From Swiss-Prot:
Belongs to the Bcl-2 family. It is a single-pass membrane protein. A motif (BH3) lies at residues 86-100. This is Bcl-2-like protein 1. The modification Phosphoserine is found at S49, S62. A motif (BH1) lies at residues 129-148. Residues 27-73 are annotated as: Disordered. One of its GO terms (cellular component) is mitochondrial inner membrane. The BH4 motif is required for anti-apoptotic activity. The BH1 and BH2 motifs are required for both heterodimerization with other Bcl-2 family members and for repression of cell death. The loop between motifs BH4 and BH3 is required for the interaction with NLRP1. A motif (BH4) lies at residues 4-24. PANTHER family: BCL-2 RELATED (PTHR11256), BCL-2-LIKE PROTEIN 1 (PTHR11256:SF12).
């Protein structure tokens, strides 16, 4: 379970870093070479036991959902979605999110004022605000996009040590807080059904349908709020 979580996070962050000309391999081992920063090791140690009694993710390299409750039980006869399809759908949805909210997202990244000592507190504050009113697929996409922006900003400001930490924080949060909702709402199969094959971009062409399923509850004002939480008062 934890490996699938981290694999999705690392793939998305690697993709976002590559869009800015950076390589994940430049930063993935920075934390391991430091002795004064235990956050990543602790997070990775906690991740496997973060969710007690919940089924594994609905991915090809994980067991099929076993004993899931609610309407997700109807997925039993469906083909398991490959991990690669989930990764691709996340990439495409993240790109579409940033394209649609380009100006607000630019404000977010330009207002980040982080240091190695305050980064986790800022990450936690923003993510808690993002999901304050509940979870939906659009907010999960925003969560990944925020993590990607945070990594890029960290590298731009020569704080490469934060990249692997951010990956661990995201994987842990995904396990602890988002996976139960994901399983109760059809698993990653449903996400790929909604977002696969660049569905978000296609839906944007039908403007009246976009807000109904892509970013329900996640407005431009919400994105700006994420940025404002990082501003020094």
């Amino acid at each position: 379970m934890s490996q699938s979580n981290r694999e999705l996070v690392v793939d998305f962050l690697s993709y976002k870093l590559s869009q800015k000309g950076y390589s994940w391999s430049q930063f993935s081992d920075v934390e391991e070479n430091r002795t004064e920063a235990p956050e990543e090791t602790e997070a990775e140690r906690e991740t496997p036991s973060a969710i007690n009694g919940n089924p594994s993710w609905h991915l090809a390299d994980s067991p099929a959902v076993n004993g899931a409750t609610g309407h997700s039980s109807s997925l039993d006869a469906r083909e398991v979605i490959p991990m690669a399809a989930v990764k691709q759908a996340l990439r495409e949805a993240g790109d579409e999110f940033e394209l649609r909210y380009r100006r607000a997202f630019s404000d977010l990244t330009s207002q980040l004022h982080i240091t190695p000592g305050t980064a986790y507190q800022s990450f936690e504050q923003v993510v808690n605000e993002l999901f304050r009113d509940g979870v939906n697929w659009g907010r999960i996409v925003a969560f990944f996009s925020f993590g990607g922006a945070l990594c890029v900003e960290s590298v731009d400001k020569e704080m490469q040590v934060l990249v692997s930490r951010i990956a661990s924080w995201m994987a842990t949060y995904l396990n602890d807080h988002l996976e139960p909702w994901i399983q109760e709402n059809g698993g990653w199969d449903t996400f790929v059904d909604l977002y696969g094959n660049n569905a978000a971009a296609e839906s944007r062409k039908g403007q009246e349908r976009f807000n109904r399923w892509f970013l329900t509850g996640m407005t431009v004002a919400g994105v700006v709020l994420l940025g404002s939480l990082f501003s020094r008062k």
